[in-house]
């Protein structure tokens, strides 16, 4: 039996405890994904960390429904590749037994979703897998000599988000603060 711990039902129960055959699927829909769930200073992320800690103490079967794209506009860059490994390790440390990473399924080429899918597969198989190794394997294998430019593009966006401490939830559109005229010209 599975139940969603989602939005208004996300907080751990105060008095009830799920039976051993009940899966609690905790959803991160309100979170900022530009930073690791655990390392972000936003209130939604702090609340999510508190909630996963609470559920981890009481649920034998804690699963995650995590988000990896902008659902408002699939072609809008969603620079979260540097958080994927940290988040998966965070889930593992908190007794999570199943992870569903919802990405861009309706537009298979939006925002380098194949790269993100490859990296998530590597981290789900081995949470200690190196982020740069996973990224470079895919970029070099798929793009060959052009991979250098793809990696520069990925780093350009991720560096801008990190430098300016930009927060991103899953409903961002093309008017995001990290897509400045300067960044778009460089991209």
Model feature map: region roles:
Residues 107-108, 113, 121-126, 137-179:
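Long, charge-rich alpha-helical interaction segments
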Residues 1-136, 141, 181-186:
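Catalytic-core regions of glycoside hydrolase
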